[in-house]
Amino acid sequence: EKLNDGFARDLLELETCIAHIADAPETPALQPEALQTLNAESVMESQYLPRAALRIMRFAHNIHAYYDAVVHQKSQPRCEATPLWLAVFRDDDAVWRLPLSRGEARLLIALQKEKTLSQAIDLAHTDMLAENEDVAALLHHYLQRWMQHRLLSHTHLPQAQSLERNMQCA
């Protein structure tokens, strides 16, 4: 089947992204133990910083299925326009692709912009609600998935909130 221009452009963007991710600096993955020390308020007011070798991309075509078929020498799917959000990341010197929902992608993009989890949820709330009315359960699912795929680098409480909390304890 002849590739259309939009599909070819998406495929080129993915290939370029994979090359950049392969060269991006490696940052250590967040370990689950780091989350165990946070209380409920700290969880929401912390920043969860994604790893440096992570890009969130939006495509007009499902190039992930096509790329996967080519890599694994399967029959190639039709190159129809199907919107796709995709995380492209490196872990242990291997480049990976992970399809995302729109809400999950919007949340990760907000975290890349150093928003707190609470701020990121505010930005992605409408998209998350479209997926599941139980935003808390959806958030739990996202965090589990991100930890499983090692997408996050570290977490920290923004300085102003940390200082305020220390003053309240004094």
Regions from the PLM with identified roles:
Residues 50-113:
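Low-complexity, glycine/alanine/valine/leucine- and proline-rich hydrophobic stretches
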Residues 48, 66-67, 142, 149:
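Sequence-level detector for tyrosine residue identity
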Residues 1-39, 93, 98-170:
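Long, charge-rich, low-complexity alpha-helical segments
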Residues 10-11, 44-49, 77-79, 144:
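A general structural signal for short secondary-structure junctions and capping/turn motifs
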